[in-house]
Design a protein with these regions (language model features):
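Compositionally biased terminal segments of proteins
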Residues: 1-157
Length: 157
């Protein structure tokens, strides 16, 4: 699967916006939208866990071309902690309960809007990777922390 790209991020933003889905880009895809120089194979989305939001997300994903099974649709509608989708035009990880972030509402308050993309604050992205403590996250954390210093100094106010 090729790297997730900006055009695909735009497609996600537009479809989820049409269906009024409350979500944030998180993980490496979120960091990349903030300017982090890297690539990723998928979009990571932190989704507000409500039945209405889950149902809207199912409609948006189908519109994007994802072939959701009934089980996947049910998991999304119910807000299962983590749902990985590899049956669409690109890969998506749906995270309803990311490690290191207490509540969606808190992350929403701290979010960064960049070119219309709702993105988790870089501090939340880092906290989530620290809490997940996966090998690939431990490897990327030093670069993310270094980027954080640059980003805080140079981001538009």
């Amino acid at each position: 699967m090729p790297a997730f790209d900006y055009r695909q991020a735009e497609e996600v933003r537009e479809a989820l916006s049409r269906h009024h889905v409350r979500y944030l880009f998180i993980g490496k895809s979120g960091a990349i939208l903030l300017g982090f120089p890297d690539t990723t194979q998928d979009a990571d989305l932190f989704v507000d866990r409500t039945p209405e939001n889950g149902l809207a997300l199912v409609f948006a994903l189908r519109e994007l071309g994802f072939s959701l099974t009934e089980d996947q649709a049910r998991e999304i509608e119910s807000g299962k902690d983590f749902v990985q989708l590899k049956n669409g035009p690109f890969d998506v990880d749906l995270v309803f309960a990311p490690d290191g972030i207490e509540r969606f509402a808190d992350a929403w308050q701290r979010r960064v809007e960049i070119q219309g993309f709702p993105v988790c604050h870089l501090d939340d992205i880092i906290a989530s990777k620290e809490a997940a403590n996966r090998q690939k996250d431990r490897e990327s954390l030093p670069r993310l922390r270094a980027f954080r210093e640059y980003w805080l100094r140079n981001r538009p106010s």
